[in-house]
Amino acid sequence: VSTSNDRIKVWTRIDLTFRASTKFNNPYADALVWVDLEGPDFSRRVYGFWNGGDEWVVRVLANAPGEWHWTSGSSPKDAGLSGQSGRFVAESWTAAELDANPNRRGMIGASANGRGLQYADGTPFFLLGDTWWSLPSFRFPLADKATATGTLGPQSTLNDYVAVRKAQGFNCVGLIAAQPAWANDGKPNSLQMDDGTWVRAAWKQPGTQSAKDMHNEGGRPFEFPGKVPGFEDVFPDMDRINPDYFKTLDRKIDYLNEQGMVPFIEISRRDSGQCWQKFHDWPESYARYVQYMIARYGAHITLLSPIHYDYYEQTIPAEDYNVPINLAIERYGKPPFGTMLTANPNPSTLVNFGTDSWIDLHQSGNVREHYTYWYLTEMFEAERKPAINGEPYYAGLHQLGEPYPLRVPPDSEDDRIYVRSGLYGSFLSGGLAGFIYGAEGIWQSDVEPESLHKMWDSFGWESGNQVQHLKTFATVEGQRYLELTPCTEMVVPNKTGPGYAYKGWSYCAATPDRSLIMLYFEADAPMEARLRGVRPGDRFLPRFFDPRNGNWHDPGEAISVPRNGVLPLPPRPDAMDWGLMLQRL
């Protein structure tokens, strides 16, 4: 972070701080601050946010080398907020500096063909994420940067967890910025008003019947008392924000960015929707919060989501969230420095928000078994935007409300098979931009003595270590994977076994000219398989991939497509899951 008025590096955040002369009753809602920022091929109004007391901050950066200048404004006009100006000069990073932290390459955006992701300078970004929904809370304490040891246990810090995942090739973590009504307050974790309105649908804190605590050293994200009759001490006033809570989150986001990690920030979970809509000025109140979070984190290297819509129950319809989200974008514009907008959806961003929406990065989410990977194919065919599976099967999954019917011992081979099904089945179904992993104990950040799986133990599970092999599989031919089109029906058979499972199915994706064909066979898929849709007489070099260790086997003997155009595939090494590449000779 820089507050300098002279020389900085490109893609370095600058906090421009202003002190208001006016004493506002509710600064969060009563004033708007901005700077008009001008630079090389850039001219944009960048909005700021209230940061507590009389302080407002506008966060800016330079996306290109050269001279930049800004002038501030506010509504209502204020002597301390309006009419200020400044300048700075941006310089490029050296090659060594770029190698030290890839986030210095700029914001994440879509690849040239719209199927993958890349940094602003064009360097490919294959997203490999982990699910740390509770990162803003005390459950992920941030230590002195010099003390991270990588040793996992009750004393573990955010620094330790980042070190572990960074060493395993992860480059992204997902988090929910605010769980407004969640606290271990002695009241049930799921609360409804007499008329059925949902007050909260929280995760249960182990050892209690109440909701999980989600505060941090700055407190909780919004102020009390709230406006919901009878629940003023449970559901806060969503029109009065607590900047101290977000200052703590700032430091964690800063640390992630310094470590080369890209946070995927979801600003709120869907269970706050009914009381927010019913007892506040909707859509204005939610649109204000959307803009606040874009202003606060739009100059970090992040992915931003205006709603964590992981389920369509205990909330308002997705189209009702669309109203304030679109209002914020129409009024203030999309994030000024190119931050992609996305969301965790159920079952997909396409189903919930449609085509030609504010979505920049499509996701499937909170749907798990292999029959759901098709949603990625549907998005692939609907429009040319990158896509990922953002919430597949959780390693060690025990229950989601009810005990999970397919649960297996955590970190068993079956558990790892389930995870790998999600990794490779999703990729070949159209999720070419990457994948977000999750594990029991980590996704809900269990630290209590009564927890079934404590999060520091779950970080040691082998399935997390195997996630990095997806990139090895995808990039065997460099960036050619971005040319792949899902075509599972080319491989026969491809669906032996039930849809509500992770075994027995096969997947296929190929380049349009069929010169590169990638396949994945789940465990227990038939050993004999054939490939149709290839040209008689063409010859292919087969090569198997072991998703357990990331090793490509030596190529086998060339195989030729017979006159009927149906190619018998070589049997995989055993009945476990395997990847296969066919290169046309």
Kindly label every feature range from the protein language model.
Residues 1-41, 46-48, 87-94, 501-510:
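Non-catalytic, glycine-rich low-complexity segments
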Residues 32, 102-105, 111-372:
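Active-site mouth of glycoside hydrolases
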